[in-house]
Amino acid sequence: MRVSRVLKTGAALTGVAAAAGTVAYALSRRPYLREVAPGLRSPVLYLPMHLLADATFARASRFFASIDFSRPIRHAVDITEFSASFDGHAFSARVLTPRGATAGAAASGPRPVVVWTHGGGHLIGGPAMYDPQNARMAAELGAIVVAPRYHKSTQEPFPADHDECYAALRWVQENGDKLGGDTSRIAVAGDSAGGGLAAGLVQRAFDEGHPVRALGLVYPMLDHRTTDKSGAVGQFIWTAGPNRGAWSMYLGDDHLDVDLPPYASPATRSDLSGLP
């Protein structure tokens, strides 16, 4: 009986300590939350991602690198997939095509094309996860969205993903009419790691004489030299530790001490003249 009572008391004290620690942690996060726009505040922002060691998230992500799943869409688009190769690099892509006439195009005739490279820190994600966003983009712009798959850095580091996505872009530039696209109106866009990929693709296409019409960057990973920031910047979700770990996984642990190949870290390009 005495042992049982001691165990119960210990469990109760442990619970109280855990609750007190949780409250203290939540209170410590409030100053950072106040810097976030009210409409963007969420319980998710309390997750202690800022406490992760640099490589923890990057290493753990190898278990999720190949996961891709479609999500419900609310726009009238047709979704297909195809595989091809260009200049010796094989790739596969998801294609979203709007149905009928839209604000951006007639029901028939070539449509503009957006090559969308998805985000995920070069670690996770897939084009199907972006179906809702890409379907909306296709429907509202009257554009065909081509979203290539690519290897994650835990599978193959740079330049594997760059080469796959560049092959997809060049294929679209040369064969986009087979999808109903207007090859004179091609844009490249992406978010997070996909934004960095998009920037590198556009730079390379320009350098090799195949410029595109537009570039869209959504909170892109552009610069491997990113450092810690003050205040609330870098305190939520994609924090400094995972960011450093992701760049190391993508470019190597010595990426801050060596000269990187072109397009690996697009922000290092000094001359942006002529780019969209």
State the predicted function of each range:
Residues 66, 84-86:
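Short linear interaction segments
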